[in-house]
């Protein structure tokens, strides 16, 4: 319909000119003015038609493209803020490319280059639908796919998210259990986080967004008598450099292999997901947090390993600082004289401004957990790489923190449970630090605070230490911490 409207505006133009005018017109279209091929007809057949003067809900459509035949309907009913932003950006990109083509600076083949979706964003949400049989998978995938727009709308309401871009293509997903046959389908959603000024640590809680989506899908499955205990939805957060572990090889461009840990898809119905986002090159592995014990002096958000019988939560941080914000790729403005080209005036309905919806704020404290005390730990403490130097913490839960823990960022990550180990770690090589840390891990913690002064960690986005007494952890949680 957009092409037909372009042909109406330029009835005598040749094909190459129409392509250029197509991108010119709709890259500058003032949405939500509707695109109409003809004025709506009035018939007394009592069928619902798109008319914002009569239907208040039609006034909130963001990108109305109206079908010409009666009853007229909005063909882009499912367009969201993010979807419209992606399409407008592509219109501008197409305009820039066609400008180059008309100036003989590029070939027409450039207009058909594959998109760079899997290189465009730094953070992604993976949705996975699984079923025991192929027939059930087809039904289950159809239901989940029809509800993804609800998840996108929920993510857009998060005050820290600027864009949620869904890849329209679904992908097969490898099965976790080789002994049990499963049929799995996966969708990928790219995220752009808002750049916050005067904030070094940004905590984003996606628990409510993901949970409301899964509840809606399961409720619909129950109402349609499709629900069975073996059909599931899994959701997780991954970074760009982890995608090659989960997607087919032909989807991603070939590049150097990265040495990273394996990523495990965790069902939302099984455990909570606690993720720490420190840099583009870091990697977060979701794991259950119900029985995890870590070193009490670990105050940088790095969960250290313990005995093999206990689930391990890892967060590996590289030593180079990178900004985790992904600015949206702004398309190059049209070159040449396209700005001076006139667009024929057409009669359109006045723009119906969308009433802003109430913003649901879900702020999770970004204050790092420091000096959390528990009983002396006798388990093996695994040495982890030091995080980015110079990353500041906003505040500390208590005022009695030992000053030895804040000398440098490197001392903070390499410290063990005693002052003597801190002094010796500076002189020992990397391999000896790990062994020495294991020998000293059973020593009592200096400067321990009484239990009455311990801070509650239930509101922290990156829980690195659990108290001695287990606390209730909300299930189905996906929390991110972005360090500026």
From Swiss-Prot:
Q: Where in the cell is it found?
A: Nucleus
Q: Which domain of life is it from?
A: Eukaryota
> What are its GO biological-process terms?
mRNA processing; RNA 3'-end processing
Catalytic reaction annotation = RNA(n) + ATP = RNA(n)-3'-adenine ribonucleotide + diphosphate
User: Pfam families attached here?
Assistant: PAP_central, PAP_RNA-bind
**Motif placement: Nuclear localization signal 1:** 240-257
Q: What is its EC number?
A: 2.7.7.19
Biased composition annotated in UniProt, kind: Basic and acidic residues: 423-441
Region labeled Disordered — which residues?
276-314, 326-356, 375-484
> Which InterPro entries does this chain map to?
NuclTrfase_I-like_C (IPR011068), PolA_pol_cen_dom (IPR007012), PolA_pol_RNA-bd_dom (IPR007010), PolyA_polymerase (IPR014492)
Q: Which GO terms describe its molecular function?
A: ATP binding; poly(A) RNA polymerase activity; RNA binding
Q: Does the keyword Nucleus apply?
A: yes
The record places the motif (Nuclear localization signal 2) at 392-407
- This protein's record includes keyword Nucleotide-binding: yes
Which of UniProt's keywords are assigned here?
A: ATP-binding, mRNA processing, Nucleotide-binding, Nucleus, RNA-binding, Transferase
Low complexity compositional bias, start-end = 451-464
Q: Which GO terms describe its cellular component?
A: nucleus
Principal place where this protein is found? Answer: nucleus
**Family (UniProt):** Belongs to the poly(A) polymerase family.
Q: How does it assemble?
A: Monomer.
- Annotated function: Polymerase that creates the 3'-poly(A) tail of mRNA's. May acquire specificity through interaction with a cleavage and polyadenylation factor (CPSF).
What protein am I looking at? Answer: Poly(A) polymerase alpha-B
Q: Which organism is it from?
A: Xenopus laevis (African clawed frog)
């Amino acid at each position: 319909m957009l092409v037909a409207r372009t042909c109406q505006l330029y009835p005598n133009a040749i094909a190459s000119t129409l392509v250029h005018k197509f991108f010119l017109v709709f890259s500058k279209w003032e949405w939500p003015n509707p695109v109409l091929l003809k004025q709506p007809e009035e018939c007394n057949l009592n069928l619902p038609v798109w008319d914002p003067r009569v239907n208040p809900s039609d006034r909130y459509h963001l990108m109305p493209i109206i079908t010409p035949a009666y009853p007229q309907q909005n063909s882009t009913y499912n367009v969201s803020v993010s979807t419209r932003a992606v399409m407008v950006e592509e219109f501008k990109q197409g305009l820039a490319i066609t400008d180059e083509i008309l100036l003989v600076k590029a070939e027409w083949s450039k207009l058909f280059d594959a998109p760079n979706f899997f290189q465009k964003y730094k953070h992604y949400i993976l949705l996975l639908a699984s079923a025991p049989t192929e027939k059930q998978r087809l039904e289950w995938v159809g239901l989940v796919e029809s509800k993804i727009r609800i998840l996108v709308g929920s993510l857009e309401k998060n005050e820290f998210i600027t864009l949620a871009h869904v890849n329209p293509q679904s992908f097969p997903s490898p099965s976790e259990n080789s002994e049990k046959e499963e049929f799995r389908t996966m969708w990928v959603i790219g995220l752009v986080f808002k750049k916050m000024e005067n904030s070094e640590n940004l905590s984003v809680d996606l628990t409510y967004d993901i949970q409301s989506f899964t509840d809606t899908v399961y409720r619909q499955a129950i109402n349609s008598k499709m629900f069975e205990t073996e059909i599931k939805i899994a959701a997780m957060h991954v970074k760009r450099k982890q995608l090659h572990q989960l997607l087919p090889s032909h989807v991603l461009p070939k590049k150097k292999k990265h040495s990273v840990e394996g990523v495990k898809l965790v069902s939302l119905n099984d455990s909570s997901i606690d993720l720490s986002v420190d840099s583009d090159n870091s990697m977060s592995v979701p794991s259950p947090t119900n029985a995890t014990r870590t070193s009490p002096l670990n105050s940088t958000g790095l969960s250290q390993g313990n005995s093999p019988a206990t689930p391990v939560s890892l967060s590996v941080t590289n030593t180079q600082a990178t900004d985790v914000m992904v600015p949206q790729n702004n398309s190059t403005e049209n070159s040449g004289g396209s700005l001076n080209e006139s667009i024929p005036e057409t009669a359109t309905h006045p723009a119906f401004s969308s009433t802003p919806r109430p913003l649901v704020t879900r702020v999770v404290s970004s204050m790092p957990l420091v000096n959390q005390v528990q009983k002396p730990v006798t388990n093996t403490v695994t040495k982890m790489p030091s995080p980015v130097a110079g990353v500041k913490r906003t505040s500390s839960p208590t005022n009695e923190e030992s000053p030895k823990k804040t000398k440098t960022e490197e001392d903070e990550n390499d410290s063990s449970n005693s002052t003597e180990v801190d002094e010796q770690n500076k002189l020992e090589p990397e391999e000896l630090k790990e062994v020495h840390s294991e020998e000293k891990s059973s020593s009592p913690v200096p400067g321990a605070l009484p239990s009455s002064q311990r801070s509650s960690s239930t509101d922290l986005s990156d829980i690195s230490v659990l108290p001695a007494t287990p606390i209730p952890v909300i299930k189905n949680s996906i929390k991110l911490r972005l360090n500026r």
